[in-house]
Amino acid sequence: MNRENMAQRYCALIIGILFAVIGLAGFVPGLVSLPPTGGAIPVDTSPDIYSAGFGYLFGLFPTNLLHNIVRIVVGSVGIVAYTSLGGARLYNRGFAIAYALIAIMGLLPVAQTTFGLMPIFGNNVWFNALTAIVAGYFGFVQPTQTMPQMNTSPRS
């Protein structure tokens, strides 16, 4: 396996580990701070799918219960995709497209909650855009080297 192919696989693995760890960190109460008074979701609101577990991971990234679960799933898929070149390439391409669209949605005020399910505003926008750019580079831009074909014709 050549270096370019391994780079695609390592990209899927690193993004997978990053998202799995961030998703798991969202369940650690000491790493999630409550929103400020008068914030996007007041602490005293009735629980719904959006406000369940809402807080700021590391004080920076808005998150909630569903967002943490999605990050763990996306991360797990990346870790599994690492096992093959085709899987890693497909993961990197799909991740780049999906997370670029999510970053764009985060810039639009009407879509900053992923249709009322997950927060994608604030620091989530640049984080999603940055990871989409990295995955896009390894999924689309970096040339994929294939094994040279062997000439199997009989010699005369």
Where are each of the predicted segments found?
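Membrane-interface extramembranous regions
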Residues: M1-S156
